């Protein structure tokens, strides 16, 4: 996992926050990496272990960047007639150098479910915190670009509503308890590909027999692109759940990769995505396996993850 908190536009993902690590290697040695604001001493070893999902060693200590307590904040909510128009606004905001802590876009289905608006409305939320001067400047850019791209100003209370319920997964748990298969799939892609990936991936996952609902939101933005976060739910017979789950993941992932997106933005690979790693990395997969062989020749660290060979013959997912 390369975790991305909900305010990552301001503070970064975990690989941006880690300053140094203590790692126990597969042979028992302990090393210390990083610790300086910036270094130029060969490859940055901290990044070798962050996101390696335990396949190269065990992280036992971490030194993280910290920030002063925010003294100001600002917020706004906007409604768009299309997902693509809102994506363009977000692109323009970050390309101007503004990095609001929260810049999130919900498609019509998720906007209706989370904010009670009509399904034709795509809700964009913006929130920033920090030094008041910087916050005001950031929110001014948000306002200017949203107005320039045809958004309707919605009530700022939608941002407060989001903060109050952002970690509430009770609705999903209700569906799961009724036998639905529910999961999420997050990816990243360049700005030019995002709208196409959104529409085609939703369509591909909906086309899998048994799918009842597929929706998406955009949750992490960068100058060159952003993250799309899909949620799907399906209802099939109990003995068909594994097959459905595999099929909907295959449909979504293949569509994303075909259209130039990534395999994962922050959740990582684990077992479920392992079958796609070789394709996603291309020639880089050989480098990854060479690093694994050099650091862990006996394959004792988290066998079978990241699509790497399992020295102990463990079953992958889906089971062959």
Label each PLM-derived region with a short phrase.
Residues 1-104, 301, 317-320:
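FAD-binding subdomain of flavoenzyme oxidoreductases
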Residues 29, 273-320:
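Activity-critical C-terminal alpha-helical subdomain
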Residues 31, 100-102, 152-155, 263-265, ...:
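Acidic/polar loop patches that form or flank catalytic/metal-binding clefts of enzymes
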Residues 31-49, 246-260, 289:
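Short, hydrophobic/aliphatic alpha-helical segments
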Residues 60-62, 197-198, 274, 303-304:
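Short hydrophobic alpha-helical segments that form membrane-spanning helices or hydrophobic packing faces
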Residues 68, 74, 79, 85-251, ...:
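C-terminal substrate-recognition/cap domain of FAD-linked oxidoreductases
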Residues 76, 182, 271-278:
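Short beta-alpha connecting loops at secondary-structure transitions
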Residues 260-275, 304:
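A glycine-biased, small/acidic residue-tolerant capping/turn segment at secondary-structure junctions
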């Amino acid at each position: 996992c390369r975790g991305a908190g909900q305010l990552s536009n301001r503070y970064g993902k975990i690989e941006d926050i880690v300053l140094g690590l203590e790692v126990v290697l597969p042979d028992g040695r302990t090393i210390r990496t990083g610790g300086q604001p910036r270094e130029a001493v060969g490859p940055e070893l901290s990044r070798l272990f962050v996101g390696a999902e335990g396949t190269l060693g065990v992280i036992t200590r971490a030194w993280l960047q910290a920030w002063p307590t925010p003294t100001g904040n600002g917020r706004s909510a906007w409604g768009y007639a299309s997902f693509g128009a809102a994506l363009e606004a977000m692109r323009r905001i970050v390309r101007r150098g503004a990095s609001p802590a929260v810049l999130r876009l919900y498609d019509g289905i998720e906007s209706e479910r989370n904010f009670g608006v009509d399904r034709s409305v795509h809700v964009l939320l913006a929130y920033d915190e920090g030094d008041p001067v910087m916050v005001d400047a950031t929110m001014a850019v948000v306002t200017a670009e949203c107005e320039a791209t045809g958004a309707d100003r919605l009530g700022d209370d939608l941002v407060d509503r989001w903060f109050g319920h952002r970690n509430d997964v009770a609705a999903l748990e209700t569906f799961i308890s009724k036998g639905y298969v529910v999961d999420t799939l997050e990816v990243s892609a360049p700005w030019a590909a995002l709208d196409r990936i959104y529409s085609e991936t939703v369509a591909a996952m909906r086309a899998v027999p048994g799918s009842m609902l597929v929706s998406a939101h955009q949750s992490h933005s960068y100058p060159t692109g952003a993250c799309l976060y899909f949620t799907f739910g399906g209802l099939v017979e109990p003995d068909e759940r594994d097959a459905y789950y595999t099929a909907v993941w295959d449909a979504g992932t293949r569509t994303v990769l075909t259209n130039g997106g990534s395999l994962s933005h922050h959740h990582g690979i684990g077992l479920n995505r392992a079958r796609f790693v070789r394709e996603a990395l291309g020639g880089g997969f050989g480098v990854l396996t060479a690093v694994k062989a050099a650091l862990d020749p006996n394959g004792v660290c988290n066998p079978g993850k990241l699509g790497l060979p399992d020295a102990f013959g463990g079953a992958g997912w889906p089971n062959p």
